[in-house]
């Protein structure tokens, strides 16, 4: 008989298909990413979302780096339960670790701006006219007694050269030019070096020169009595200068340099000391009022001619208290000559009025009066405030020749302290007095120019 078919052995089916072994990692939170990964990546744990890291939390243990470390069996309590912060939907290059404002190498400090070299773009050049206060060597080639091209003059000038400046060093024109920001040393127009055709001398010519002549005055007879360059001849040199400039830079640029440059004039002291009170003996023919009016008219005429030659920025410096210079004190027993000082103040007062009238009359002009009288008066009244120890005697030994005003030649004894003297010789300030007075002068009037 047929064997009863044995019951098939129970299928090993009851074994449910091997459920995926429970992942040691907590169930993956639904990722807010737009594309959820369809299947777990080789790593059983989802790649840990990069921590935003704005503030690195004190992660327990080594902060798990997002990367292929396939065995993160450590159940880190932090990363998973933390609901992924909304800001990191698609790992926007997590503000690349907001480059902590730290190692942003602080930008190297720009080199400290070096002081501007003398070359003022607003005032491209300076032109000086007048007497010894501005003369930088124009008298050297003249047949005149009024020369200072010998020692001890210039003993404090660079290289100790006696250039013909009426001082132990620099003079007013040098300091005015320096404080206007143009250049530190102003050449004399007739200096032979300026006649050379090299580039250096030509650039020196472009930034201005001095036409002044020691001993000159507003009145022609003052200059003629000393055989020096008259104010009218200085204007002739100015015309010649313009011709040379046109050859160098052309007509248009020459016109600009002359009109934008500062033309500065100082005269009057020699008219009063020598022509009125001295050998000229004009005080016998004219009273001081009419003589100073004549001087002021001559000054106005000079300014008008300067304007006619293209100058538009014109400064006219008054007369200082010349009655207090060493050579003029002698006659009054070391006391200031008040007659001279009165005449100087009278002339200055007329100069202020006439320059004011010209300033209103001449279109596109800037005409400024420079009050040097009050600046020097303060230095005479309180010398210790400026570091001067001697205001009545000159620093150098005066010779009897040359009007009893100039230093004897080759006398260098006891002159190492020239800066403590207000006056260098019988009439002219020391280099230090020039420096202080002209710094104050420029500071006071620069905004007008």
UniProtKB/Swiss-Prot annotation:
Annotated tissue distribution: Found in anther, only in male fertile plants.
Leader sequence segment: none
Protein name, UniProt field: Anther-specific proline-rich protein APG
GO annotation terms (biological process): lipid metabolic process
Coiled coil: none
Bias-annotated ranges (Pro residues): 1-118
Active-site residues, Swiss-Prot/TrEMBL: 132, 425, 428
Domain of life per record: Eukaryota
InterPro entries the record matches: GDSL (IPR001087), GDSL_lipolytic_enzyme (IPR050592), Lipase_GDSL_AS (IPR008265), SGNH_hydro_sf (IPR036514), SGNH_plant_lipase-like (IPR035669)
Stored Gene3D superfamilies: SGNH hydrolase
Family of this protein: Belongs to the 'GDSL' lipolytic enzyme family.
Gene Ontology molecular function: any one: lipase activity
Region feature Disordered, mapped onto this chain: 1-123
């Amino acid at each position: 008989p047929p064997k009863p078919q044995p019951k098939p052995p129970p299928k090993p089916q009851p074994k449910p298909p091997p459920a995926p072994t429970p992942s040691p990692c907590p169930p993956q939170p639904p990722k807010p990413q737009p594309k959820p990964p369809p299947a777990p990546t080789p790593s059983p744990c989802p790649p840990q979302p990069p921590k935003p890291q704005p503030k690195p939390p004190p992660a327990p243990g080594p902060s798990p780096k997002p990367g292929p470390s396939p065995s993160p069996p450590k159940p880190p309590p932090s990363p998973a339960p933390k609901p992924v912060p909304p800001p990191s939907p698609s790992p926007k290059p997590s503000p690349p670790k907001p480059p902590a404002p730290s190692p942003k190498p602080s930008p190297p400090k720009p080199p400290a701006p070096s002081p501007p070299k003398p070359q003022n773009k607003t005032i491209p050049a300076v032109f000086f006219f007048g007497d010894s206060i501005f003369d930088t060597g124009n008298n050297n080639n003249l047949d005149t007694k009024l020369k200072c091209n010998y020692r001890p003059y210039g003993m404090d000038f660079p290289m100790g050269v006696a250039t013909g400046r009426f001082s132990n060093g620099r003079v007013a024109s040098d300091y005015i030019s320096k404080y206007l920001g143009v250049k530190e040393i102003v050449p004399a127009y007739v200096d032979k070096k300026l006649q050379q055709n090299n580039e250096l001398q030509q650039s020196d010519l472009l930034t201005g020169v001095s036409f002044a002549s020691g001993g000159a005055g507003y009145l022609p007879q003052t200059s003629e009595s000393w055989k020096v360059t008259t104010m009218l001849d200085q204007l002739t040199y100015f015309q010649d200068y313009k011709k040379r400039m046109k050859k160098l830079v052309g007509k248009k640029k020459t016109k600009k340099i002359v009109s934008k440059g500062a033309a500065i004039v100082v005269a009057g002291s020699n008219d009063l000391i020598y022509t009125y009170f001295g050998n000229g003996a004009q005080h016998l023919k004219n009273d001081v009022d009419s003589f100073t009016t004549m001087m002021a008219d001559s000054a106005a005429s000079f300014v008008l001619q300067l304007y006619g030659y293209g100058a538009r920025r014109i400064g006219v410096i008054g007369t200082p208290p010349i009655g207090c210079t060493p050579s003029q004190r002698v006659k009054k027993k070391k006391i200031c000559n008040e007659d001279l000082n009165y005449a100087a103040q009278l002339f200055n007062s007329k100069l202020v009025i006439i320059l004011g009238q010209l300033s209103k009359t001449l279109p596109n002009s800037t005409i400024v009066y420079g009050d040097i009288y009050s600046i020097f008066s303060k230095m005479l009244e309180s010398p210790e405030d400026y570091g001067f120890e001697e205001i009545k005697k000159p620093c150098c030994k005066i010779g009897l020749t040359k009007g009893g005003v100039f230093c004897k030649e080759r006398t260098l004894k006891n002159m190492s302290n020239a800066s403590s003297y207000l006056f260098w010789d019988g009439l002219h300030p020391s280099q230090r007095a020039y420096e202080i007075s002209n710094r104050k002068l420029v500071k006071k009037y620069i905004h007008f120019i």
